């Protein structure tokens, strides 16, 4: 960005990462967080234009750097509503029989809280945690250890296509207990399927569900 400005080329910084990336748990050891934070500062100072995904991040740039940005939110495809078939055959799931989390299995998604809270709830519903590990398998193993002994908690692994459609289409509730987000695609998708959504009280989720 510095060199581009020196040579009088316009620079548009597209901050489409999910949230303020340097705050993520995976960057807190070593120099990762400082390096990414410096990149954020450079974007605010030197880019000709900055694009953000959420009003929360837009407010952050205004309050932190006095920088005006352009808000261009995520969008999703029209949903394919499907009856439970594949998910019944593979996981024994039926319509309204489970609470769904679907997303990357990373610490900032709040899945630890979800598992711990669910284990204390008396319900016949299952908790379906759908998604793959983003960086390493260590967090996935931590979650499975946390869920050990509760047969209601199901890990599906990465899903796509008709399987993903069925999970969204037949969930009793979709939940996203994140600590940190940009504009969560999985929440937008869940809402497009008409799901009742239970989300954490952070601006990036609140501005999507509104009420």
Name every feature range the model reports, one short phrase each:
Residues 97, 101, 106-120, 141:
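A conserved mid-protein helix/loop that constitutes part of the nucleotide-sugar donor-binding site
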Residues 26, 76-91:
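Acidic anion/phosphate-binding donor-loop and adjacent secondary structure
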Residues 158-159, 166-171:
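Short alpha-helical donor nucleotide-sugar binding micro-motif in glycosyltransferases
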Residues 196-199:
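Short hydrophobic beta-strand element within catalytic cores of glycosyltransferases
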Residues 56, 75:
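Carbohydrate-associated surface elements
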Residues 179:
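Aromatic "clamp/platform" in nucleotide-sugar-dependent glycosyltransferases that forms part
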Residues 31-50:
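Membrane-proximal helix-turn-helix segments that form the acceptor-binding/catalytic region
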Residues 59, 123-152, 156, 163:
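Short, structured helix-loop element that forms part of the nucleotide-activated donor/catalytic region
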